[in-house]
């Protein structure tokens, strides 16, 4: 379609309509609401580095599993201590991957982190705080390398226009 110059013959729409399935909404019902309805979100993969060693000699290594654990605990303070109570924010560590053996201290650990916010300034603060905390914990743990941050799945705030929402609601109620 793009090769057929569709972009040139189509007019820019006045509004975009989308839908999202919510577990909290009963089947067969349609929910509408003006204003902010779905938070902005981003995910980040963080890789922290250690120094591998045998589990019987942990003093010879830098344990990235312990490092990842301290990062998870410290990240929990972002929302509770750095974001104003009137704001909405979430920081979730959804996965940690590290190592393959019970008696080997591995070289690295990976954390998969997701954030949600309704305010772009809060979202930016979450990003900065995650990086600050990860970097500081890496220094405290004697990590031999800088952490790696890979951002993905970035979604903007869904903020429904009042007039468009009213028009859609009227159509569903008809």
At which residue positions do the language-model features occur?
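Histidine/acidic-residue-rich, glycine-tolerant segments that coordinate divalent metal ions
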Residues: 1-95, 99-104
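Metal-dependent amide/peptide-bond hydrolase catalytic core
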Residues: 66-174
């Amino acid at each position: 379609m793009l090769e057929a110059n569709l972009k040139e013959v189509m007019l820019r729409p006045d509004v975009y309509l989308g839908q999202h399935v919510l577990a909290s909404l009963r089947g067969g019902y349609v929910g509408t609401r003006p204003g902010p309805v779905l938070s902005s979100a981003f995910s980040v993969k963080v890789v922290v580095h250690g120094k591998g060693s045998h589990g019987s000699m942990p003093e010879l290594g830098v344990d990235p599993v312990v490092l990842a654990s301290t990062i998870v605990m410290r990240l929990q303070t972002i929302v509770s201590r750095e974001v104003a109570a009137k704001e909405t924010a979430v920081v979730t560590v959804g996965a940690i991957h590290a190592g393959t053996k019970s008696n080997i201290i591995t070289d690295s650990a990976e954390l998969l982190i997701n954030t949600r916010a309704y305010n772009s300034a809060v979202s930016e603060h979450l990003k900065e705080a995650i990086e600050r905390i990860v970097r500081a914990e890496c220094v405290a743990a004697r990590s031999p390398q800088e952490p790696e941050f890979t951002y993905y799945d970035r979604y903007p705030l869904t903020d429904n226009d009042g007039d468009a929402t009213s028009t859609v609601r009227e159509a569903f109620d008809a």
